[in-house]
Amino acid sequence: MSFDLYAPHTIKQQTPMMQQYLKIKSEHRDILLFYRMGDFYELFFDDAKRAAQLLDISQTQRGKAGGDPIPMAGVPYHAVENYLARLVQMGESVAICEQVGDPATSKGPVDRKVVRIVTPGTISDEALLQERQDNLLTSVWQSKNGTYGIAYLDINSGRFNVVEVNTDEAFTSTIQRLAPAELLYSESFENVHLIEHIKGARRRPEWEFDLDTAQHLLCEQFGTKDLVGFGVDKAHCALVAAGCLMQYVKDTQRIALPHIRAITLEHNEHAVILDAATRKNLELTVNLSGGFENTLAQVLDKTATPMGSRLLKRRIHTPVRNKDELNSRLNAISAILDVQLCGELHESLREIGDVERVIARLALCTARPRDLTRLRSALQALAPLHTLLNDASDPRIASIIKQSPELPDLQALLERAVIENPPVLIRDGGVIAPGYNSELDEWRNLSKGATDVLDQLELRERARTGISTLKIGYNRVHGFFIEVSRANAHLVPADYIRRQTLKNNERYIIPELKEHEDKVLGSQSKALALEKQLYEELFRFIAPHIEQLQIMAAALADLDVLNNLAERALTLNYAKPILCDNDNISIKQGRHPVVEQVMKEPFIANPVELNAQRKMLIITGPNMGGKSTYMRQTALIVLMAHIGSYVPADSAKIGNIDRIFTRIGASDDLASGRSTFMVEMTETATILNNATAQSLVLMDEIGRGTSTYDGLSLAYATADHLASKISAKTLFATHYFELTELAEQTPGLVNVHLDAIEHNDTIAFMHTVLDGAASKSFGLQVAALAGVPRSVINQAKQKLKLLENHQSVTAPNIEQQAFTFNNQAQQISPSEVELQLTAIDPDNLSPRQAHDLLYKLKALL
């Protein structure tokens, strides 16, 4: 519409109901408004058009504005959660406007107000959440010096973290790890292209990103004078982001947030850093197609509880370097295996369920009746769990038991207060157990026993009056009455008060019936009102226990992860890794944790040795021979050791790794206009610029996307730089057999190959890693296996012979190719003379300076 919908003169022209709608909508212009009208939530104007398109619902019209029909769409109130779930998944936010006034007493439109705002990052209703995935609200801020501050909150657990990073690469990796459901960024944020793929990205006003305001908000939330005790006081960029996030949560939730009790600063030096390419290539929790199948998480995650599943995924994405913490996890797994308790612990933990999110909903006052029974079941499951673990000598397990004590008073309260199987909603009552409150029992009994009382009264009045046809009736206009035929009207006692005269009957009321009427008509509504009051009172009783319950939930999630990894180790024949102070890697008969689960035939295990004498393995062998699998399994075994898991190997000694890099596979990045080769080179540059001697680097087929000599030269220079300049532990797979000569020239380089046996025109892949370089690539044999026509294979063989004969005469060796590469590099890079000439300002040179400069330039030639 061309006119200003929210202008005062426009609003005045509307009906009273539409005036009310527009005033409320003007406060929530950027999001959808669900406006409650009877049994429906209605949407109007552009909201109606958008909702009709997104939800595939009918669009109608109601009234006119500016001479045009007002678009309208609606959803039934009883099905609203389903529609909200769909909108949230699309990244939409919705303001829920409810009727808060009494229609019976309202003059004009019933009073309405927005009672909650549902956004992708702040939802708490279990119907809207993925139970085994974190649902994070994230806020980002970039300072003038380029530092990124990132704050993220899981409102369903109260975990509130901040981190600062200094590069686009680190920022992208962090956002990929968090996978936020909703992301807030400032109007001045320049690198929007780094976050534009996030459905729930929201631009916020610049004034919301203010350090002083952030510090005030956070201190107010935590009840502290400053933030020193949390260790975040110096992280100014992160605090600015956290302040915006906290204000947003307060605005959308509109209630206290008692379960958000602390803020934690992440330290990158404590973690094994994974960049975005590594997370993608290793398929940790998402496969290359965007699904969950055949990922590391799918193999490892058999947790009993959703909160345990979420914790396991967080650990997979945040491997740590702290040996004490890792050994604590590994020793706890060993203790569980020693007492053979995996199965029993799993069943006990299943009874505890997702208590983490239940506690958050209780804190947010959005819990439903069945959340109370879930908390009750969790508390009831603690006693048998303690019995199982009472004799545990492991310090971590003992600490878990200490952090999850039984709470008999709270358990007894919930057992008394809530029925065994309550309804989904409190709306219609039937949640509070009989015997919990005597007044509620009285109102319920009165409502349920009304018929019996009336039957007894009717019999008594018949006997008292002698009128056998006397009966008690009810209608909405006159309420309860005693009906007597006109023929018997003369028998009516004096205390009967006429209420209505009909053609053949008279209707009366007596004080006892009037008293009963008042009680019965009000008993159901009074029972429901009292039950809702008692239900809300339960929240207040639970509130003082929130902090203790959160500690309990975190401890039990940890136990679930440890028990799950113990079961995986037992079932899948994993070994306990030994964590070393050096940066060596020694794996005996390692296996790929995912591939071995999907293969029908037995997986061929292989060793890996990386140390000062074997810094880099140059891996050759045929396509389909297993080079990529061998490299990936090494990275996954190292990663699993750094999350505190047993590993798929006969044994493993894993050193202190600071980062894992992968350059495996590539595809065009069409959205950014980057070719496959450009993507490959960008990832290679990231590795060469960031790897250290403590890094594990996986390089697969560097240099494929350009000419043979260019590709070979780049592969040579990359391998040489990694080995000679960085000394990173590297697995370098290649089809450039010329690179195998590097092992003779560079200390610490070793050739290995994936074995294959050729018989006539066929090939058998042995998938065994052997020392030495491969003899050939078997490319034609693999092509034949793929179904390439025989005539094409034969022609390729003839061409291959010609090329091999020609190459033996003309092809330069590796040193010559390196020289060529260096010459090319020199041609690309400006010489010292060129740099000096570029810097000259002729207008500001004296004759003497010009003379001296000429001699200097000549000396540089």
Curated annotation (Swiss-Prot):
GO terms for cellular component: cytosol. Keywords: ATP-binding, DNA damage, DNA repair, DNA-binding, Nucleotide-binding. ATP binds at residues 621-628. Pfam families: MutS_I, MutS_II, MutS_III, MutS_IV, MutS_V. GO terms for molecular function: ATP binding; ATP-dependent DNA damage sensor activity; damaged DNA binding; mismatched DNA binding. InterPro entries: DNA_mismatch_repair_MutS, DNA_mismatch_repair_MutS-lik_N, DNA_mismatch_repair_MutS/MSH, DNA_mismatch_repair_MutS_C, DNA_mismatch_repair_MutS_clamp, DNA_mismatch_repair_MutS_core, DNA_mismatch_repair_MutS_N, DNA_mismatch_repair_MutS_sf. GO terms for biological process: mismatch repair. HAMAP family: MutS. Belongs to the DNA mismatch repair MutS family. This protein is involved in the repair of mismatches in DNA. It is possible that it carries out the mismatch recognition step. This protein has a weak ATPase activity. This is DNA mismatch repair protein MutS.
